[in-house]
Curated annotation (Swiss-Prot):
Regulates the transcription of the pyrimidine nucleotide (pyr) operon in response to exogenous pyrimidines. Also displays a weak uracil phosphoribosyltransferase activity which is not physiologically significant. Belongs to the purine/pyrimidine phosphoribosyltransferase family. PyrR subfamily. GO terms for molecular function: uracil phosphoribosyltransferase activity. It catalyses: UMP + diphosphate = 5-phospho-alpha-D-ribose 1-diphosphate + uracil. Disulfide bonds: none annotated. GO terms for biological process: regulation of DNA-templated transcription. This is Bifunctional protein PyrR.
Length: 178
């Protein structure tokens, strides 16, 4: 039997969601000159770039953007296997900055735990916040996003797949299950 695929967000819905997330980030940030968006590879990094462009459109302020590779900070390498790491691209000190970690989907919270550990290697931010496109629940750690594009109750065995134009050739969020 083939898996059932349901589109959760279309290209237009993703665009609107990113506009809303960018507005929320702006509202919660005292000084936009101190704002840094750090995307978690791969799709989180792409989303961080899209959010930065949206913030610049809304506010006329260029926001610093970096990309974070958490490969060596994961606690599940024995389960998922070691993947070829991508070099983090953070060409600035994070000390004193307002850092918003950006990821596509939050599930158990382990990716974010690893990202928090990785951020410490780049300085000591004033505050770290979390923005996700999709929150599917089922947390195993006490981690909660500050900015959520879409809350999506799921079964643990279901899969949420994010597709982004610059990487996958299309924009969509799909729920895959039986």
């Amino acid at each position: 039997m083939s898996a059932k695929v349901v589109e959760i967000l279309s290209s237009e819905e993703i665009r609107r969601t990113l506009t809303r997330l960018a507005s929320q980030i702006v509202e919660r940030t005292r000084d936009l000159s101190q704002l840094v968006l750090l995307g978690i590879y791969t799709r989180g990094a792409l989303l961080a770039e899209l959010l930065a462009r949206q913030i610049e459109t809304l506010e006329g302020v260029a926001v610093s953007v970096g990309a974070l590779d958490i490969t060596f900070y994961r606690d599940d390498l024995d389960t998922i296997g070691l993947r070829t790491p991508t070099k983090s691209e953070i060409p600035f000190d994070l000390t004193g900055k307002t850092v918003v970690l950006v990821d596509d989907v939050i599930f158990k919270g382990r990716t974010i735990r690893a990202a928090l550990n990785a951020v410490n290697d780049y300085g000591r931010p004033e505050v770290i916040r979390l923005a996700v496109l999709v929150d599917r629940g089922h947390r195993e750690l006490p981690i909660h996003p500050d900015f959520i594009g879409k809350k999506l109750p799921t079964a643990k065995e279901e899969v949420v797949k994010v597709y982004l134009q610059n990487y996958d050739g299309r924009d969509a969020v799909e729920l895959i299950g039986d």
